């Protein structure tokens, strides 16, 4: 399970080094194999261990190619999907189209989301945190039935 937010840097070749605390679990549990794709609702990337991504693909197979919304989702998620492997130094090479989609600059944030990571441009992440705070204060948040029994 992946949790926490880590500041990371992109090098001039478009590589990011995964923080050391995640490298061993990724290597042992997932053979260092990942799939990177785009988030269809935010300007960030999603990094899934290959086994977790296989579950997503099984769901995508059930979607129709004739319904515009379902086809659009498949196009985005599968069209940008890039299979990769951590190198010996724990780095991933991010293809240019993915870096462009997320507007990634030199400084980025890798954010654990249990079964996957989000990869954000650092400035965009700070903006997203502010938006999330506002959402939590919103009346709709308080009325959300799925969150009614959630407590910390």
Curated annotation (Swiss-Prot):
A cellular-component GO term for this protein: cytoplasm
GO MF annotations, alphabetized: DNA-binding transcription factor activity; transcription cis-regulatory region binding
Principal subcellular localisation of the protein: cytoplasm
Keywords, comma-separated and alphabetical: Cytoplasm, DNA-binding, Repeat, Transcription, Transcription regulation
Ranges of residues in domain SpoVT-AbrB: 5-52, 81-124
Keyword Phosphoprotein recorded: no
InterPro entries per the UniProt record, alphabetical: MraZ, MraZ_C, MraZ_dom, MraZ_N, MraZ_sf, SpoVT-AbrB_dom, SpoVT-AbrB_sf
CDD domains per the UniProt record, alphabetical: MraZ_C (cd16321), MraZ_N (cd16320)
GO biological process: negative regulation of DNA-templated transcription initiation
Localization annotation: Cytoplasm, Nucleoid
Chain ranges passing through the membrane: none
Pfam families the record matches: MraZ
Similarity comment text for this entry: Belongs to the MraZ family.
NCBIfam families associated with the record: division/cell wall cluster transcriptional repressor MraZ
SUBUNIT field: Forms oligomers.
Protein's name according to its UniProt entry: Transcriptional regulator MraZ
Lineage: Bacteria, Pseudomonadati, Pseudomonadota, Gammaproteobacteria, Alteromonadales
């Amino acid at each position: 399970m992946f949790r926490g937010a880590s500041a990371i840097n992109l090098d001039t070749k478009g590589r990011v080094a995964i923080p050391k605390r995640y490298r061993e679990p990724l290597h042992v549990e997932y053979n260092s194999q990942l799939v990177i794709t785009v988030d269809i609702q935010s300007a960030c990337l999603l990094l899934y261990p290959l086994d977790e991504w296989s579950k997503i693909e099984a769901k995508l197979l059930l979607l129709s190619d004739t319904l515009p919304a379902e086809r659009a989702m498949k196009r985005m998620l599968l069209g940008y999907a890039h299979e990769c492997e951590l190198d010996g130094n724990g780095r991933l090479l991010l293809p240019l189209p993915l870096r462009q989609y997320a507007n990634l600059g030199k400084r980025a944030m890798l954010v654990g989301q249990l079964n996957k990571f989000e990869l954000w441009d650092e400035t965009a992440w700070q903006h997203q945190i502010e938006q999330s705070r506002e959402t939590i204060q919103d009346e709709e948040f308080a009325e959300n039935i799925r969150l009614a029994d959630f407590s910390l």
